[in-house]
Amino acid sequence: MSGATLEAYLASCTARGDDLSRDVAAVIQRLAKAALDIRKLVNQGALGTAFNGTHGGSNTDGDLQKDLDILCDDQFLTCLQGAPVACYASEELENPVLLDPSARLAVAIDPLDGSSNIDNNVSIGTIFSVLPAAKGPDVDPSQSFLQPGNRQLAAGFFIYGPQTALVLSLGKGTEIFIFSSRLGCFVEAYKSAIIPERAHEFAINMSNYRHWEEAIRLYVDDCLAGSEGPRERDFNMRWIASLVAETYRILIRGGIFLYPADGRKGYSQGRLRLVYEANPIAFIIENAGGAATTSIDRILDLVPENLHQRVPLVFGSRREVARITRYHVDPNMIGERAPLFGKRGLFRA
């Protein structure tokens, strides 16, 4: 059932707001316009000139940059020229770009999340965070991004899949808009999305089981044990390897997503980036009634140490996220498990 257009929704949200809220709305509309251009590039697939080319360099994550990654980054950076944005930070750039020092907003973005999966026609997307810009004489632009996620003014992601969608939170609920080809704009499809408290699905990359810490193994063992185990109900496992696709599914159907720290080289602090991946996703999830943590600590309370800091990420149905925290901090949680599901679990480490 369709609702307001994105433009009408933003107008209603800012009708009684201040200049800052109107600036946020202006930025979101510019991002939406750029996303529709990127949608066209993505939809060309292997027929597009940017699809198979590689840039020759690596991004801050060490991933080989595709031409499409660079094009998308340039597209968003260009669309924010002249917008009320002081500085722009991206996964594809080592340092923030200064735009308008007098502006009041900062934008952090993962321009094409999941681009390594594009050859497989998996849904990919753009994740963004809008923050108040740091102010002061000779302020370093990076300071705008070294503030906790609970200070975000807005966050969202575009997903380029069977439908092109925008998931958006301005801090009071989470809305889902679908692009209407007939109308040529985003239209509200799910108003005030609410994540079900009870989860029946979990998403994790099981191939890394042997590298996880014990609490994560035990949680997964208990889910896999199903109705015969301590959870006394069956679970399904999902793994798309696309953060935006996993998040979208959880918003619609509930469940939990886990990308924990593990014992592999480079993964001890987690893998996802706090500023432009974990923070915006956590903001969206919490405003839909869910929770997001590092397994222990609330994501939105973390103060970033640097722009590209990595963190573990667990999010989804509130009860399941809280349960994982208890597996980490409450020894009695392990002691209460049935003998069959003791520390060895269903798998040998």
From Swiss-Prot:
PROSITE patterns (alphabetical): FBPASE (PS00124)
Residues annotated as binding Mg(2+) 1: 91, 110, 112
GO biological process: fructose 1,6-bisphosphate metabolic process; fructose 6-phosphate metabolic process; fructose metabolic process; gluconeogenesis; sucrose biosynthetic process
Cofactor annotation comment: Binds 2 magnesium ions per subunit.
Keyword set, alphabetical order: Carbohydrate metabolism, Cytoplasm, Hydrolase, Magnesium, Metal-binding, Plasmid
Molecular functions per Gene Ontology: fructose 1,6-bisphosphate 1-phosphatase activity; magnesium ion binding
Catalytic activity: beta-D-fructose 1,6-bisphosphate + H2O = beta-D-fructose 6-phosphate + phosphate
Subcellular locations according to the entry: Cytoplasm
Annotated pathway: Carbohydrate biosynthesis; gluconeogenesis
Cofactor: Mg(2+)
GO (cellular component) term, any one: cytosol
UniProt: substrate binding residues: 113-116, 205
Residues annotated for Mg(2+) 2 binding in this entry: 110, 113, 277
Pfam families: FBPase (PF00316), FBPase_C (PF18913)
Predominant localisation class: cytoplasm
Entry EC number(s): 3.1.3.11
InterPro entries attached to this UniProt entry: FBPase_C_dom, FBPase_class-1, FBPase_N, FBPtase, Fructose_bisphosphatase_AS
The family this protein is said to belong to: Belongs to the FBPase class 1 family.
HAMAP family: FBPase_class1 (MF_01855)
Subunit structure: Homotetramer.
Name assigned to this protein: Fructose-1,6-bisphosphatase class 1
Organism classification: Bacteria, Pseudomonadati, Pseudomonadota, Alphaproteobacteria, Hyphomicrobiales
